[in-house]
Amino acid sequence: MTIMQGRSTVRQSPLQPGDPAPDFVLPAVDRDGTVSLADYRGKAPVLLAPMRGLYCAFCRRQIAQMGFTRQKLRALGVEVLAIVATTPERARLYYRFRPAGVPLAADPHLTTLRAYGVPHRALTPEVSQIFASRLSDLAHELKIPATDINEIQSALCRRDGYEPTQTDEEDLQRHGGQFVGQFLVDRGGIVRWINIEGAAEGEAGVGKFPSDDELLAAARASLGLGPGERS
């Protein structure tokens, strides 16, 4: 199954290790043309990281982190692809001035998140409060001297050089309470490892991204790599 931009097959539960990973064709952000899972088939395993839109401070931070993580995973022979849920034009504008250091694709309609079965909840006041609480935790971690959620969001935006646009607001309203995940897919197109936001820790896991050590350990274990081995 190949997912084209704007067309979505919705899974009711996340893909599991051993499942075939649905292919996709999405606009590239860091270069011209498109990017697909088929680009990696037969060549290298790839860590896929579909994110929310640029409005998400956690996702902006995680994509920046992946620029460093990528170098460590490539030493194991593993490629990385981040997918940001906004229009290619919006993503290119933001990352033109803040290069991510990782290959990027744009998926404004959440086709990959839905096809890979990543949970989605309506953006109820309760769900909004979960995200607000985690933003407060992030502000504390970054030593941002603010307690009001609007002040925290503004401070995080300034820190990232991010100015919200109408496109971002439309993305937020359309996406609702979308969670994210990471999927390690081998060169044969089979899922070998997954991590779903909040699955292990509940609300405390919202906004968290695996550490480099966790990702490297997952790559070695799921791909059967010994010390010093590459995929």
Give the ranges of each region predicted by the language model.
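Short, positively charged
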Residues: M4-Q5, A155-Q166, R220-P227
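Short active-site neighborhood of thiol/selenol oxidoreductases, capturing the structured segment around
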Residues: V35-G67, E79-V80
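Thiol/selenol-based redox catalytic cores and closely related redox-interacting motifs
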Residues: D107-G202
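N-terminal "domain-start" segment that seeds a small globular fold
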Residues: T2-A38
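A short, polar/charged loop-to-alpha-helix boundary motif
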Residues: G198-G224
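Structural microenvironment flanking redox-active thiols in thiol-disulfide oxidoreductases
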Residues: Q62-A115
